[in-house]
């Protein structure tokens, strides 16, 4: 049996009596007592997540921009100012998604990506292979000397500034998907990015691993509530944000996973997977579902792999949960083309075909329900 990996905050989670689970080979907190309360803290105040299992990778060299023009489906030509970030998929030649990631621009000779925990080794091997085979001459450096804390919620930024006062000057004017470096803090040099995976405002903070426990404790002292992977999943689902390995994978095109907006075909770039995407186009629609209630009560819970029956044929749920914010059972589903918001479909739950409404994603953003 392979031993689970630990983040630098592992002992802290144990001390907080977190319930730990195996997540992509990492021993991670699923909750610290009440997943619902952690979810609500992020929607109404501020919560924080240890996402140090994700991997920071630095890319340096003269041809780093050309490398990412080749590697990513989104266009790094959009990255022109230091700290600007871009969400993209990494595709294989068949147009399937190797991973989804965020890439940061720090200079013409320095880009940084943050990749998912379960795919980090695969991604780094793929990056190295492309670098070697196509002669980009880059230095590619995984940075396991860094940890990441995501602080999310309507009061998240103020509580970060209360914890690290001179981070305010560097980060107050940041727009979403921008980052700033903050030097000489009690927690070392921080990279503070206005990004997240919850549908709320906040920061994702890259911090030297040696200082992350002190930062975590200082944030908690300011009233930021620790939150686990359980709340992270219900929050991202409400926010209409995909999870790699569930909503897309090596065999699924971004065009069939609600991620067409991350594919830039406007520029004459021969990114890997482009030819296949252009040849095949989109074959399915990616939609939200809300299960109808039975006499005002939840009729069931929508879960991954349940069959969805539509007038146009069958589809499948990719992610599902009970939404604490909406008090509804919600899901993402991949369904035949032609299924539209407002349609009613039927989901096979055990031996019943239960009705569900098709909606446009997301369900919730910035604490507000957008559907229903």
UniProtKB/Swiss-Prot annotation:
Key words, A-Z: Aminotransferase, Transferase
Catalytic activity annotation: N(6)-[(R)-S(8)-aminomethyldihydrolipoyl]-L-lysyl-[protein] + (6S)-5,6,7,8-tetrahydrofolate = N(6)-[(R)-dihydrolipoyl]-L-lysyl-[protein] + (6R)-5,10-methylene-5,6,7,8-tetrahydrofolate + NH4(+)
Presence of keyword Transferase: yes
EC number per UniProt: 2.1.2.10
Coiled coil: none
One cellular component (GO) term of this entry: cytosol
Keyword Transferase: yes
Major enzyme class: transferase
UniProt superkingdom: Bacteria
Matching Pfam families: GCV_T, GCV_T_C
Molecular function in Gene Ontology: aminomethyltransferase activity; transaminase activity
Biological process (GO), any one: glycine decarboxylation via glycine cleavage system
The family this protein is said to belong to: Belongs to the GcvT family.
NCBIfam families listed in its UniProt record: gcvT (TIGR00528), PRK00389.1 (NF001567)
Known partners and oligomeric status: The glycine cleavage system is composed of four proteins: P, T, L and H.
Its biological purpose: The glycine cleavage system catalyzes the degradation of glycine.
Protein name (Swiss-Prot/TrEMBL): Aminomethyltransferase
Source species: Paraburkholderia phymatum (strain DSM 17167 / CIP 108236 / LMG 21445 / STM815) (Burkholderia phymatum)
Lineage: Bacteria, Pseudomonadati, Pseudomonadota, Betaproteobacteria, Burkholderiales
């Amino acid at each position: 049996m392979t031993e689970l990996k630990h983040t630098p905050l592992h002992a802290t989670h144990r001390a907080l009596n977190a319930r730990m689970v195996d997540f992509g080979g990492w021993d991670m907190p699923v909750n610290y007592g009440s997943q619902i309360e952690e979810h609500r803290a992020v929607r109404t105040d501020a919560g924080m997540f240890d996402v140090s299992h994700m991997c920071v990778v630095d890319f340096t060299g003269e041809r780093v921009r050309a490398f990412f023009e080749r590697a990513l489906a989104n266009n790094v030509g959009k990255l022109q100012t230091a700290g600007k970030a871009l969400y993209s998929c990494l595709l294989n030649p068949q147009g399937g998604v190797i991973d989804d990631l965020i890439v940061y621009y720090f200079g013409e000779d320095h880009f940084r990506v943050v990749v998912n925990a379960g795919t980090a080794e695969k991604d780094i091997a793929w990056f190295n292979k492309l670098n070697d085979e196509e002669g980009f001459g880059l230095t590619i450096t995984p940075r396991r000397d860094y940890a990441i804390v995501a602080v999310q919620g309507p009061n998240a930024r103020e509580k970060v500034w209360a914890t690290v006062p001179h981070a305010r000057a560097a980060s107050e004017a940041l727009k979403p998907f921008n980052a700033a470096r903050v030097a000489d803090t009690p927690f070392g040099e921080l990279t503070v990015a206005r990004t997240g995976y919850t549908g709320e405002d906040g920061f994702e903070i890259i911090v030297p691993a040696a200082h992350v426990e002190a930062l975590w404790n200082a944030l908690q002292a300011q009233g930021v509530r620790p939150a686990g992977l359980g709340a992270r999943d219900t929050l991202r689902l409400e926010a209409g944000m995909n999870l790699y390995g569930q909503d897309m994978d090596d065999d699924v095109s971004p065009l069939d996973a609600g991620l067409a907006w991350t594919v830039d075909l406007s520029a004459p770039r021969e990114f890997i997977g482009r030819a296949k995407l252009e040849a095949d186009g989109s074959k399915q629609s990616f939609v939200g579902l809300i299960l109808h209630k039975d006499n005002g009560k939840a009729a069931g819970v929508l879960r991954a792999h349940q069959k969805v029956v539509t007038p146009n044929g069958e589809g499948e749920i990719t992610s599902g949960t009970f939404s604490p914010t909406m008090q509804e059972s919600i899901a993402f589903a991949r369904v035949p083309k032609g299924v539209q918001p407002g349609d009613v479909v039927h989901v096979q739950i055990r031996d019943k075909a239960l009705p569900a409404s098709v909606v446009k994603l997301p369900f919730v953003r910035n604490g507000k329900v957008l559907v229903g």
